[in-house]
């Protein structure tokens, strides 16, 4: 008998394939406070029992593989394996189940969103035994959360830096997103900031193209910021997109922005990657820059209800990786966003402690301990008539960002900014006086337009613009109470 055979025999090795559920389905397991918990929406192939499908997810995202291997005997699988500890049927959906999986904390590198996702979703989504798989939610335990630095500054520090309190912040994405020269781009930034906005923004795909190189854009935007600040007496900012082809180039652009003295930069965290995003967040923290995060590419990952990763998971990952703002849908605009689901992950971004609430799609209680919060950004197809609803839905700790809803004003950029600022101030004042924004919103806007010709013109242009499409991502029947 060879030494290798003797070793295999001594550890009880028996070659062959066995059902995952024999090892990885553990319905009597009691989860630990240090476990990372995951809720997967599982659609098994015909003939695959849900217990086997859930166990396969736990195995393939932790220690398991398709066959028994003799090296299993060289470690403690009970210590390191993922466990499918509960399965529930999704009512109203054919052959769909929620499989709950617990992962020991030792499986993950400290402070690495990249490693966390590589482990949990890196390979299992291509598994043939599953027709579809979606990661609905994660419970990040405090023991793991404390290994991350999170947002560079957080909500309160940002308000103190900007000296802006008691209302949502106002922004605008410069349009057209591509094709403007750096000088004309800077002119649009100046007009919007002078009109009353707090921020303007590079769009997600504005990087460094032949028609407008990044350095030229940074310089003209900085000039616009300082000029508008001098004229209005308010602190202004422009989200300078530092996203680049390499981490080194990204940090070089961030350093140039810091040298210009601007307050905020921007990153596309999904296309740029979590490693790059975490590196940039660390740089922003050390150098006093706020970090705006765009979620470009998110719908490729989160749009389908039965496959992918829900945005609430991507939002949690961003809070760990680091960002002071992140786009979060609008509920009322042109982009996907069901109200209760959106409010659920907005709370997960901002609050320190969020209770489990299936009526809002929150599968686990989440304790962020001391990790700073992130401002949700409402952006996409919104205009002045949406202002009461946006103020009511998102509250003060948010950024309301109007692109076409500013630049599409018939009188130009600055009047468009004035219209939005007047509408916001009117809604905040009405709310503070006890009016119901949901019920009285239209009358509040009409009354304010009586003394603001800029708002009156905006109201006339967008009075019939609506986006009446149902959300693809909706609550399950067993979540609706």
UniProtKB/Swiss-Prot annotation:
Residue numbers bearing the N6,N6,N6-trimethyllysine modification: 14
Transmembrane feature ranges: none
Pro-piece positions: 1-2
List of residues binding substrate: 123, 173, 177, 295, 327, 379
EC number: 4.1.1.39
InterPro entries (UniProt xref): RuBisCO (IPR033966), RuBisCo_large_chain_AS (IPR020878), RuBisCO_lsu_C (IPR000685), RuBisCO_lsu_C_sf (IPR036376), RuBisCO_lsu_fd_N (IPR017443), RuBisCO_lsu_N_sf (IPR036422), RuBisCO_lsuI (IPR020888)
Cofactors required: Mg(2+)
Stored CDD domains: RuBisCO_large_I
Keyword NAD found: no
Binding site residues for Mg(2+): 201, 203-204
Catalytic activity: 2 (2R)-3-phosphoglycerate + 2 H(+) = D-ribulose 1,5-bisphosphate + CO2 + H2O; D-ribulose 1,5-bisphosphate + O2 = 2-phosphoglycolate + (2R)-3-phosphoglycerate + 2 H(+)
Annotated positions of the N6-carboxylysine modification: 201
Localisation: Plastid
Chief location category: plastid
Role: RuBisCO catalyzes two reactions: the carboxylation of D-ribulose 1,5-bisphosphate, the primary event in carbon dioxide fixation, as well as the oxidative fragmentation of the pentose substrate in the photorespiration process. Both reactions occur simultaneously and in competition at the same active site.
Record's miscellaneous remark: The basic functional RuBisCO is composed of a large chain homodimer in a 'head-to-tail' conformation. In form I RuBisCO this homodimer is arranged in a barrel-like tetramer with the small subunits forming a tetrameric 'cap' on each end of the 'barrel'.
Subunit details: Heterohexadecamer of 8 large chains and 8 small chains; disulfide-linked. The disulfide link is formed within the large subunit homodimers.
Name this polypeptide is given: Ribulose bisphosphate carboxylase large chain
Originating species: Cuscuta sandwichiana
Lineage: Eukaryota, Viridiplantae, Streptophyta, Embryophyta, Tracheophyta
Gene name per UniProt: rbcL
